């Protein structure tokens, strides 16, 4: 009995399991038990519903069988070609580690990236090719603003062939990143130039994920034109519960006829 009047009971938290608990109140008299509220045959239920964030975390854990870490390696590049036959191409590699929190803060991560490229230093048949190089570290964060809205942010610091390199970027995904969605985003790496994309992903042939993108980029520090544009088609496949692979092909140009590019990637979850 409470000192403030009335009666109360405390149930240990570890004794409660979803969807909740049930109780009844009886008293003991000389004639036996007297039911005051509900009964053993018909107890009063108390439902304990998890919050939306808790439910989403449980769904993530069930989908990934409790695996919260991932390591991925991606390699992408494109040859833009040039109407004068000069080389205009880039190759970009990134190694990333991600820890999934699976709450409103969905994941955090860090990684390392490298960019190599050659591009004409001017417009014309006698332009010389300049080399563009960059090495940088990445810090990433993903926020689940809604069950089907994810917002990504990243910062990059490193060095390029011209000195200190800073960068940043962001993206928004409408839908589930691991199923059908539409995403758009951009990033910038100081003197190496900006990149922006719009991508549609669909899962009609699960477990194969397919995607189509439009990408505009100045990589690798293009001097001829800022209109490097290509389309990209990619396929992702989950080989087993812990291993996924990706392949992509791209086609587009900057100054002249279109050329091909592509990419590969691998990710392991643990």
Segments (PLM) and residue ranges:
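Glycine- and aromatic-enriched membrane insertion/assembly motifs of diderm outer-membrane
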Residues: 87-157, 169
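Residue-level signature of outer-membrane beta-barrel architecture
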Residues: 99-101, 141-145, 172-176, 200-204, ...
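Outer-membrane beta-barrel "beta-signal"
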Residues: 258-270
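Transmembrane beta-barrel strands of outer-membrane/channel proteins
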Residues: 71-77, 108-116, 153-159, 170, ...
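Repeated loop/turn-to-beta-strand initiation elements of outer-membrane beta-barrel proteins
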Residues: 103-108, 146-153, 177-184, 205-212, ...
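Glycan-association/targeting regions that enable binding to alpha-glucans and other polysaccharides
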Residues: 1-89, 110-112
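Outer membrane beta-barrel transmembrane domains
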Residues: 123-128, 197-248
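Solvent-exposed loop/turn segments connecting transmembrane beta-strands
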Residues: 81-90, 102, 116-118, 131-133, ...
């Amino acid at each position: 009995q409470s000192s403030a009047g009335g009666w109360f009971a405390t149930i240990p938290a570890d004794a409660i399991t979803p969807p909740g608990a049930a109780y009844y109140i009886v008293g003991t008299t000389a004639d036996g038990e007297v039911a005051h509220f509900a009964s053993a045959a018909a107890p009063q239920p108390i439902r304990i519903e998890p919050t939306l964030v808790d439910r989403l975390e449980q769904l993530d854990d069930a989908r990934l069988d409790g695996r919260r870490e991932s390591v991925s390696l991606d390699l992408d590049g494109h040859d833009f070609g040039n109407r004068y036959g000069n080389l205009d191409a880039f190759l970009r590699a990134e190694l990333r580690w991600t820890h999934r929190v699976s709450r409103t803060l969905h994941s955090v991560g860090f990684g390392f990236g490298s960019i190599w490229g050659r591009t004409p230093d001017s417009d014309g048949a006698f332009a010389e090719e300049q080399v563009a190089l960059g090495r940088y570290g990445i810090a990433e964060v993903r926020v689940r603003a809604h069950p089907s809205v994810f917002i990504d942010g990243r910062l990059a610091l490193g060095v390029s062939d011209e000195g200190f390199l800073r960068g940043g970027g962001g993206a928004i995904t409408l839908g589930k990143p691991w199923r059908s969605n539409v995403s758009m985003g951009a990033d910038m790496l100081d003197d190496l130039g900006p990149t922006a994309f719009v991508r549609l992903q669909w899962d009609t042939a699960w477990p194969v994920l397919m995607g189509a993108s439009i990408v505009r980029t100045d990589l690798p520090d293009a001097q001829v034109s800022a209109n490097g544009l290509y389309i990209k088609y990619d396929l992702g496949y989950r080989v087993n519960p812990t291993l996924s692979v990706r392949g992509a092909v791209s086609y587009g140009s900057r100054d002249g006829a279109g050329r091909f590019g592509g990419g590969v990637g691998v990710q392991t979850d643990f």
